[in-house]
């Protein structure tokens, strides 16, 4: 049974951000410091990545552990209230994440997914991984341009 009234639960859920979270802001700042210039939450890219480098086809997602099902089999057992709803919701999110990643890869995108806690603990390392992915795609991009 939920300890909150439906109105309290609604307010609580509405306060959960889908963009502009602290981990996203930290990664944005670190990438900017490395000279990376990105687009945020671009609706023109399937899956609406948190950060994208459209020219090089690099998409970056910062996934919250609960919402995107980190260690799902273990965490699933820990859900107490409204189990059916939450299990269905998180499993739907996991399937959607796999679909988005798969489709972007088929379309030639490099897809990086970071857990939000990993970004918080290792912001610079995550930003470096993004920079390397962009560099890898820059090299590929130049090679493809020369062949045409």
Swiss-Prot record:
Question: EC number(s) per UniProt?
Answer: 3.1.-.-
The answer to whether the entry has keyword Chloroplast is: no
Which keywords, in A-to-Z order, does the entry hold? DNA damage, DNA repair, Endonuclease, Hydrolase, Nuclease, Restriction system
Q: Give the region (Disordered) as residue ranges.
A: 1-21
What's one Pfam family here?
Answer: DUF559
- What are the annotated disulfide bridges? none
Q: Provide ranges: composition bias, Basic and acidic residues.
A: 1-10
One GO BP on record is: mismatch repair
Q: Does the keyword Nuclease apply?
A: yes
Q: Which domain of life is it from?
A: Bacteria
| Purpose | May nick NmeDI sequences that contain T/G mispairs resulting from m5C-deamination. If unrepaired, these mismatches can lead to C-to-T transition mutations. The very short patch (VSP) repair process counteracts the mutagenic process by repairing the mismatches in favor of the G-containing strand. This enzyme is an endonuclease that nicks double-stranded DNA within the sequence RTCGGB next to the thymidine residue that is mismatched to 2'-deoxyguanosine. The incision is mismatch-dependent and strand-specific.
Q: Which family does it belong to?
A: Belongs to the Vsr family.
Protein name in the entry: Type II nicking enzyme V.NmeDIP
Q: Which gene encodes it?
A: vsr
């Amino acid at each position: 049974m939920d300890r909150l009234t439906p109105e309290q639960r609604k307010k609580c859920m509405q306060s959960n951000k889908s963009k502009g979270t602290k981990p996203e802001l930290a990664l944005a700042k670190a990438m900017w410091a490395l000279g990376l210039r990105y687009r945020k939450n671009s609706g023109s890219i399937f899956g609406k990545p948190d950060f994208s480098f459209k020219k090089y086809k690099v998409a970056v997602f910062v996934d919250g552990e609960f919402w995107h099902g980190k260690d799902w089999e273990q965490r699933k057992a820990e859900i107490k209230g409204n189990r059916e709803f939450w299990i269905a919701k998180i499993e739907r999110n996991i399937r959607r994440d796999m679909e988005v990643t798969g489709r972007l890869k088929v379309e030639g995108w490099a897809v990086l997914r970071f857990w939000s806690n990993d970004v918080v603990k290792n912001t610079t390392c995550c930003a470096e991984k993004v920079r390397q992915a962009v560099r890898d795609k820059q090299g590929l991009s130049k090679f493809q341009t020369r062949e045409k």
